[in-house]
Curated annotation (Swiss-Prot):
Protein name, entry field: tRNA (guanine-N(7)-)-methyltransferase non-catalytic subunit wdr4
Region (Disordered): 376-396
Domain of life assignment: Eukaryota
Pfam families per record: WD40 (PF00400)
């Protein structure tokens, strides 16, 4: 997992987190989360601690100022770090269920975490030992949570194709639903600006643009229909696994699809309108990406030789940045810790289990019907032969 903030970069893999301050030549901050305290069982509830829990990091994010970094792991810990003036662990708190996503509020005062049971909890950043507060809930697993740029809305998406927009000050008040996806909604990204636009990605292979206040769909892009300059594969799923945005020179978007060895680059034109500007093919399937504050696109490649890639837009085309000292230094540190990071988080089909099971009842019905007809035909044939033999015996 790769995350960039205004103060630097964070990389996670397995239970490890590497934190790097922008422009620093010092070795990155390195922590194994398995070394942190674990939640103890309450008296009389020895079974409350899950013995199957690992320390794998599940979700992470920087605060808008870059001053804080938070992550959650498979042991149901919410770990908060301070990144300025140096990286250090501030607190370890616990969540009730394993989390699928987390984000900070625009003011940086709260952390919102979404979990597998469909709930969203908020945690205070300043009161770093305070327990979380339940804000809202869905009836199915949440896959992402976001906050509108003005901080007025909490936006959530779930396994059952729904995008829900709730008021921050009264989360039980639902402002709108953005409905149209035909599979689980995997990614949410509110776009900067005053137009109240939301971008969503899904397992149905579409990228959709919404007016989230009204719930109106503005545009839908079918990813399988884009000209990517590569051979089309039958039944290929374009599951959106990551979206990142840069607003330095207009709104530029970078997107990844699970199992697709390349980067989709879009721009948001007036209208508004999503336009594919470029597809960058890679030799390895990228694991993650993010923009930094200077409009550079960083890519976690999963390749031991070149674990980090950096791109810059020049004359309307995204080009690889070569001989970058910071990338070279960080890549070397990643290679040194490659085994601990488990290949910086090797590719996994995170969303494969979320697809609806297709039950072909018609095929089963036809097989049973054919078997029934064969049995009836055999019985009829046997019934016709028996009387004929009796007649012959009578004539004798």
């Amino acid at each position: 997992m790769l995350r960039l903030g205004s103060s630097g970069l964070a990389l996670t893999g397995s239970s490890r987190v590497l934190g790097h301050r922008a422009g620093s030549e010092c070795p990155p901050f390195h922590l194994d989360c398995s070394s942190l305290e674990k939640q103890s069982a309450a008296p009389g509830q020895e079974g409350s601690v899950d013995p199957q829990g690992s320390d794998k990091i599940l979700a992470a994010a920087f605060s808008p100022s870059g001053e804080y970094f938070a992550l959650t792991d498979d042991n149901k810990r919410l770990i908060l770090f301070q990144t300025k003036p140096a990286w250090e662990t501030i607190s370890v708190r616990w969540v009730s269920r394993r989390c699928t996503a987390l984000t900070f509020s625009p003011c940086g005062a709260h952390i919102l975490v979404a979990d597998k049971s469909g709930d969203v909890f908020s945690f205070s950043v300043r009161r770093s030992r305070e327990a979380g507060r339940l804000e809202l809930g869905h009836l199915s697993m949440l896959l992402d949570v976001a906050v509108s740029p003005d901080g007025n809305h909490i936006i959530t998406c779930d396994r059952d194709e729904k995008i829900r927009v709730s008021r921050w000050d009264s989360p039980h008040v639902i402002m709108s639903f953005c409905l149209g996806h035909t599979e689980f909604v995997s990614q949410l990204l509110p776009l900067p600006g005053a137009d109240k636009l939301l971008l969503s990605g899904s397992g149905d292979g579409t990228l959709r643009l919404w007016d989230y206040e009204s719930g109106r769909e503005v545009q839908s892009v079918t990813l399988s229909g884009l000209d990517l300059g590569m051979e089309r594969q039958e039944n290929k799923r374009f599951t959106v696994s990551r979206i990142s945005c840069c607003a330095c020179n207009g709104i530029q978007l970078a997107m990844l699809c699970e199992g697709v060895p390349g980067i989709f680059l879009f721009s948001v034109a007036p209208g508004p309108r999503l336009t594919l500007t470029q597809y960058v093919a890679l030799t390895h399937t990228p694991l993650d990406l993010d923009f930094d504050g200077s409009a550079y696109l960083w890519v976690l490649s999963g390749d031991w030789e070149e674990p980090l890639l950096k791109y810059k837009e020049l004359n309307g085309q995204w080009q690889s940045v070569v001989n970058d000292e910071e990338v070279t230094r960080l890549s070397g540190f990643i290679r040194e810790n490659w085994a601990d990071l488990e290949g910086a988080g090797a590719p996994e089909n995170r969303f494969a289990v979320l697809y609806k099971a297709v039950v072909d009842n018609m095929a089963t019905y036809l097989q049973k019907k054919e078997l029934r007809l064969e049995n009836e035909k055999r019985k009829t044939t046997e019934g016709q032969v028996a009387p004929a033999s009796k007649v012959q015996k009578t004539e004798c």
